[in-house]
C-alpha cells in the first residue's frame, strides 16, 4: 500500500509539472525532489529522457543570433534593453569599457537621433580636472578663459600657491568649469555618426587606452576647443609668461576629446607619389596622391608576384591537399552507404505495405484465437510509465496508451516547416498559439493523429516468428480488436523505419557539411591572399625551375629561328613560282600570237592568187576598153593602173619585213 501511495504522489506531481510553468525557487526544489524520487524508483533511460523533456524550461533567446548562450561577453542596448554578444556585433570587452550609452541598429533605424556615446578615459579626466582647477585658481580667469588686463601680479602668485577647494560646492564649480572647456559631442554631425574606420593610426594603437578615430571628431567640439586655445594664447601678459617657468608644478592643458594625430616623420615634406607612371605630389602623411595610384601599384605587384607563387604551388605537391582529398573520398563512400541504407528502408516500407494488404484480404481464424486466449496465464506487472499494477495480457495496450498520455504533455516544435523529397515523416501540425510546427513522427504523434477505426472483420496480420528473430512466413489471423499480443504492431514497425530514416538523413546532413568544409579548405588553400602572404622558398626546386625556364627559352629561340627560316624559304618559293607562272603566261601569249600570224599568212597566201586573177581580168577588160578609147585616155588610165599596183605592193613588203624582224 505504501508503494502505491508513492506512485500516486509521483504521478500527481508529474502532471502538475507538465501543466504549470514553475518559476519560483521553491517549486524548482520540488521539481528536483520529484525527479530524484522518480529516478530512484524507475531507473530507466526512457523514463529519464521523458522527465528531462517535461521538466526542461525553455531558455530565453538573446542577440541577433537568437541563442541562449550567456557564457560569452554581452552588452545591453539602452533603448530596447536587448542583450547582444560582443563578437556578434563587433565590440570587445575592452572597447565596451569606454561606452557610456549603447544603442543597437534597430533602435537607430527607428530613431536616427540616437547615437552610441563614449565616455572619457581616466587619463583624459585627470588632465581635464587639473586644467579646470588651474583655470579656477588663476586670477580673474572666468569660464570663458580670458583674463582682464588690470589684474595685479601679486594676486596671481598667491592664487597659484593656494590649495584647490575640497568642498562639494567647489567640486561642482570644477565640474561646471570643466564642461565648457572640454565641450560636449553634439551627436548629430557626420563625425559623431560615423563608425571607426579601423585603418588609421588611432584605430590601430592599443597601448594604454583606445583613442578615438580621426574621422569621428565632432565638428562642434573641435570648434569650441579651437576658440578656447585662441583665447588662452591671447589672454596672458608678458609678466605672466616670465613668472610661469618659476612654478615647479607643470600644468597640463585640457586634452581634446579626439586623439592627437600621429605624424610619421618619414612622410613629412613634399614627396613624389609611389604610383606607377605618376609624377604628382603625394598627399600629406601618405605615399600616394590618390587611392587610384595605391590600387594600381597593388595590382601591379600582384601581377608580378602571383605567377611565380602559382608556379611554386604547382611544382611542390601539397600534403594537406592530398589528405583532404582522401577525406573527401571517405566522406563520399559514407554517403553512398547512407543512400544504400535509405534504399533498404524504402524496400522495408514496401514489404510492410504488402504484409498489411495481405492481412486485409485474409479471413479471421476463430479456432486459433480461442486457443491462444486460453493459453494466457493470469500474471500481473507494474507499468513503467505510471506505476500502476496491470494484467500481463493487456500490458502492451496499457503501456502504449500511458506513453501517449505522457507524450502529449510535452511539445516538440520548430518555427520551420519540414521540406523533404517524397513522403514527409514528421507531423508538421501548425500551432498558432506558439507559432511552431510539430516535429514528432507522424506515426507516433498522440496529439494530432488518431488510430484508424478497427472493424470486427479486421485481421491482426502481424508476422509470426520463432525465437524472436526467425520469421516463419505466416501471420497472425486473430481479430485485430482482441489481439493484445500484437497491439499496434504496424504503427511500431512504421515508427522504427521512420526513426531509422531520420537517423540516416541526419547522418547524410552531417556528411554533406563535412564535404562542404573540405571543399572550402581545398579552394581556400591556394587563394590569392594565401599565396601572396605565405610562401616557402625551396632552393633546389627553384634552381631546377630556373634551369627549365632557361632551357625553355633556348628551345623557344631555336624554334622561333626555325620558323623564321621556314617562312623565308616559303616566301622565296612563292616568288619563284610566281615568276615561273609569268614566264609561262608570256610564252603562251607568244605562241598564240605566232599561231595567229601564221593563220594570217596562210589566209593571205590563199587570197593572193585570187587577187592576181582578178587583177589580170580587170587589166584585160581595161585594155579592151582602152583599145576602143582614144590614145590620150589610154595613157591616163595606164598611169592610174600603175599607181594602184604600186600602192598594192607596198603593204605586202612591209608585212614581210615585220615578220622577218619578229622571227
From Swiss-Prot:
Residues 134-183, 230-254 are annotated as: Disordered. A zinc finger (PHD-type) spans 60-110. The modification Phosphoserine is found at residue 258. Its main location: nucleus. This is CXXC-type zinc finger protein 1. GO terms for molecular function: DNA binding; methylated histone binding; zinc ion binding. Zn(2+) 2 binds at residues 197, 200, 203, 213. CDD domains: PHD_Cfp1. The lineage of its organism: Eukaryota, Metazoa, Ecdysozoa, Arthropoda, Hexapoda. It comes from the Eukaryota. It comes from Drosophila melanogaster (Fruit fly). Zn(2+) 1 binds at residues 186, 189, 192, 218. Keywords: DNA-binding, Metal-binding, Nucleus, Phosphoprotein, Transcription, Transcription regulation, Zinc, Zinc-finger. It is found in: Nucleus. Component of the SET1 complex, composed at least of the catalytic subunit Set1, wds/WDR5, Wdr82, Rbbp5, ash2, Cfp1/CXXC1, hcf and Dpy-30L1. A zinc finger (CXXC-type) spans 175-219.
Amino acid at each position: 500500500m505504501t508503494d502505491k501511495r508513492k506512485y500516486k504522489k509521483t504521478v500527481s506531481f508529474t502532471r502538475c509539472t507538465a501543466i504549470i510553468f514553475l518559476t519560483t525557487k521553491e517549486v524548482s526544489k520540488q521539481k528536483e525532489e520529484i525527479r530524484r524520487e522518480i529516478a530512484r524508483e524507475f531507473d530507466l533511460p526512457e523514463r529519464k529522457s521523458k522527465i528531462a523533456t517535461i521538466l526542461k524550461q525553455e531558455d530565453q533567446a538573446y542577440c541577433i543570433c537568437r541563442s541562449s548562450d550567456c557564457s560569452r561577453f554581452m552588452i545591453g542596448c539602452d533603448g530596447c534593453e536587448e542583450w547582444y554578444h560582443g563578437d556578434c556585433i563587433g565590440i570587445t570587452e575592452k572597447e565596451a569599457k569606454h561606452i557610456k550609452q549603447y544603442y543597437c541598429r534597430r533602435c537607430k533605424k527607428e530613431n536616427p537621433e540616437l547615437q552610441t556615446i563614449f565616455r572619457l578615459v581616466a587619463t583624459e579626466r585627470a588632465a581635464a580636472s587639473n586644467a579646470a582647477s588651474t583655470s579656477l585658481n588663476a586670477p580673474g580667469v572666468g569660464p570663458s578663459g580670458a583674463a582682464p588686463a588690470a589684474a595685479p601680479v601679486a594676486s596671481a602668485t598667491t592664487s597659484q600657491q593656494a590649495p584647490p577647494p575640497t568642498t562639494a560646492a567647489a567640486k561642482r564649480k570644477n565640474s561646471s568649469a570643466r564642461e565648457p572647456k572640454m565641450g560636449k559631442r553634439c551627436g548629430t554631425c557626420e563625425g559623431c555618426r560615423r563608425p571607426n574606420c579601423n585603418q588609421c593610426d588611432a584605430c590601430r594603437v592599443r597601448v594604454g587606452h583606445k583613442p578615438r578615430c580621426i574621422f569621428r571628431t565632432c565638428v562642434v567640439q573641435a570648434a569650441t576647443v579651437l576658440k578656447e586655445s585662441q583665447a588662452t594664447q591671447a589672454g596672458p601678459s608678458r609678466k605672466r609668461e616670465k613668472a610661469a617657468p618659476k612654478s615647479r608644478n607643470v600644468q597640463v592643458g585640457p586634452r581634446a576629446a579626439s586623439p592627437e594625430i600621429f605624424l610619421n616623420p618619414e612622410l613629412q615634406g613634399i614627396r613624389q607619389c609611389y604610383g606607377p607612371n605618376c609624377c604628382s605630389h603625394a598627399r600629406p602623411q601618405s605615399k600616394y596622391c590618390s587611392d587610384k595610384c595605391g590600387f594600381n601599384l597593388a595590382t601591379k605587384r600582384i601581377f608580378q608576384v602571383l605567377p611565380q607563387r602559382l608556379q611554386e604551388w604547382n611544382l611542390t605537391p601539397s600534403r594537406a591537399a592530398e589528405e583532404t582529398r582522401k577525406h573527401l573520398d571517405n566522406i563520399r563512400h559514407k554517403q553512398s552507404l547512407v543512400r544504400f541504407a535509405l534504399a533498404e528502408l524504402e524496400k522495408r516500407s514496401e514489404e510492410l505495405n504488402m504484409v498489411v494488404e495481405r492481412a486485409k484480404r485474409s479471413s479471421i481464424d476463430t479456432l486459433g484465437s480461442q486457443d491462444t486466449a486460453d493459453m494466457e496465464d493470469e500474471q500481473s506487472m507494474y507499468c513503467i510509465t505510471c506505476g500502476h499494477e496491470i494484467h500481463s495480457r493487456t500490458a502492451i495496450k496499457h503501456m502504449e496508451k500511458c506513453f501517449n498520455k505522457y507524450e502529449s504533455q510535452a511539445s516538440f516544435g520548430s518555427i520551420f516547416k519540414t521540406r523533404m523529397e517524397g513522403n514527409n515523416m514528421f507531423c508538421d501540425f501548425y500551432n498558432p498559439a506558439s507559432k511552431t510546427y510539430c516535429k514528432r513522427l507522424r506515426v507516433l504523434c498522440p496529439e494530432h493523429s488518431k488510430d484508424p477505426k478497427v472493424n470486427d472483420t479486421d485481421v491482426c496480420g502481424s508476422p509470426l516468428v520463432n525465437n524472436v528473430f526467425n520469421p516463419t512466413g505466416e501471420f497472425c489471423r486473430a481479430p485485430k480488436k482482441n489481439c493484445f499480443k500484437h497491439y499496434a504492431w504496424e504503427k511500431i514497425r512504421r515508427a522504427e523505419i521512420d526513426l531509422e530514416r531520420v537517423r540516416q538523413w541526419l547522418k547524410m546532413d552531417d556528411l554533406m557539411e563535412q564535404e562542404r568544409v573540405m571543399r572550402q579548405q581545398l579552394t581556400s588553400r591556394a587563394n590569392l591572399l594565401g599565396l601572396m602572404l605565405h610562401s616557402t622558398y625551396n632552393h633546389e626546386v627553384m634552381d631546377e625551375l630556373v634551369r627549365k625556364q632557361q632551357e625553355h627559352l633556348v628551345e623557344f629561340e631555336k624554334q622561333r629561328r626555325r620558323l623564321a627560316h621556314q617562312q623565308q624559304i616559303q616566301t622565296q618559293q612563292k616568288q619563284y613560282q610566281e615568276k615561273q607562272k609569268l614566264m609561262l603566261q608570256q610564252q603562251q601569249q607568244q605562241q598564240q600570237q605566232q599561231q595567229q600570224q601564221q593563220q594570217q599568212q596562210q589566209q593571205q597566201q590563199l587570197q593572193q592568187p585570187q587577187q592576181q586573177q582578178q587583177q589580170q581580168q580587170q587589166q584585160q577588160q581595161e585594155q579592151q576598153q582602152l583599145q576602143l578609147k582614144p590614145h590620150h585616155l589610154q595613157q591616163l588610165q595606164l598611169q592610174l593602173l600603175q599607181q594602184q599596183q604600186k600602192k598594192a605592193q607596198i603593204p605586202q613588203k612591209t608585212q614581210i619585213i615585220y615578220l622577218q624582224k619578229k622571227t
